[in-house]
Amino acid sequence: MAHNEAVDVVHVVLVGAGIMSATLAVLLKELDPAISLEVVELMDSGAAESSNPWNNAGTGHAGLCELNYTPQAADGNVDIKKAVHINTQFEVSKQFWTYLTRKGTFGSSKSFIAPVPHLSFVQGEKGVSFLKKRFELMHQHHAFADMEYTEDKARMAEWMPLMMPGRPADEVIAATRVMNGTDVNFGALTNQLLKHLTSAPDTQVKYCKRVTGLKRNGSGWTVSIKDVNSGSSRDVDAKFVFLGAAGAALPLLQASGIEESKGFGGFPVSGQWLRCDNPEVVKHHQAKVYSQAAVGSPPMSVPHLTPVWSMARNPCLFGPYAGFTTKFLKHGSIMDLPLSVRAGNIGPMLAVARDNMDLTKYLISEVMQSMEQRLESLRRFYPEAKAEDWRLEVAGQRVQIIKKDPKKGGVLQFGTELVAAKDGSLAALLGASPGASVTVSIMLELIERCFPDKAKGEWATKLAEIFPAREKVLETDAALYRKINAQNNIALELVEESSETQSYA
């Protein structure tokens, strides 16, 4: 194997060319144009894994329709705090895209974001009772003031014309609608950010490169990188390393040996969709519609029927149907899971296996499903669905977080977690949903944790320019929320300037 003895030196190495690394790299260059960066990616293009539109159909997460973000307690109370927070996180993402759009970083923002109504749909007395309580609470908050609720089937036929024909006349159903939802093509956005990076000084984006080693080097790191085509290797010294490699972030984090990585494990879950390209079907469904997960199913199983506007012919996807594989990436190895087992995480992993038999049964049942059984699930949404219009499409991998827990030994965590070295020299992003939609908030958290002095000092003015309002104030200040939201919507071409009173999320 050829090895280059010369060691390259950069300020920052980012592993993985997805939305996380692309966002962090562009943000760092805005804060310090002199910073030197290298992005390394195993595949031959950016956004090849979780950021790819086929692998990430749950986009535009703003808490408008995703019912798992508003859980109902045993006493019947509905908690909307998470939905409010995710909504404001998405608004922070929009502030960053607005800033870049105004700078001319992108051509038209229409290439990656578009207005799409967000609907929630429920069945049965319990479902209707829950949705009504959820609406009554959310409608009072300024972020959801435009939400509509109905139990009227004629009105629902206007909102979701594909889903209403063929239903029993006495079926108990309800829906909410927010007209000003969005859909985001994170693949297109990622590639635009990466293209922008390649034109910046002291910045490189390199493909077909595998990180084979991470070693401490004083206050920084030596990153060993192998070219998967030629077999040659090189070392890069960096003051800061970000592991944004989707499911592959966990083994890389483990390879770093930092104390903060101890006890983390990963539980890989694969995804599948039913896909429809028939234009006669697709034209009748132009909204994201989310429902409730079946009793005993994990949050990742929340069913939804959604158009993918960013693709040719704008297909519809329904799902997700879960599966199990030991791969951490769609293009990964079946050895990913077994090789991630360590003395420090085997306890939490066994505890999760013990305490999550329902999840195990669910995944087995999903894997064993026939096409006809999958169509039965679809017909809850779309009663007149025809088998010949739909085909199975493989989606991306999700690696749910397993972490130590003082009481249970280990817990399975649905969400994202930023793990950072105590000295701020390395950080990794683990987990899944809401993921891409709140990327900017997560990267801001990383900057504040790993570069605290600069965030409060020399970068503070620029951060305030890019982000005039952060999550906490957006959650509580209705007037400011409406102002920021309106500015973002105009800049991102979600509304005409004369319509600026509308609130898009």
Curated annotation (Swiss-Prot):
Domain of life: Bacteria
Protein's name according to its UniProt entry: Probable malate:quinone oxidoreductase
Family recorded in the similarity comment: Belongs to the MQO family.
UniProt cross-references to Pfam families, sorted A to Z: Mqo
InterPro entries in UniProt: FAD/NAD-bd_sf, MQO
EC number(s) per entry: 1.1.5.4
GO-annotated molecular function: 2-hydroxyglutarate dehydrogenase activity; L-malate dehydrogenase (quinone) activity
Root EC class: oxidoreductase
Pathway(s) served: Carbohydrate metabolism; tricarboxylic acid cycle; oxaloacetate from (S)-malate (quinone route): step 1/1
Species annotation: Pseudomonas fluorescens
Known cofactor(s): FAD
Catalytic activity: (S)-malate + a quinone = a quinol + oxaloacetate
GO terms of biological process kind: tricarboxylic acid cycle
Name of the encoding gene: mqo
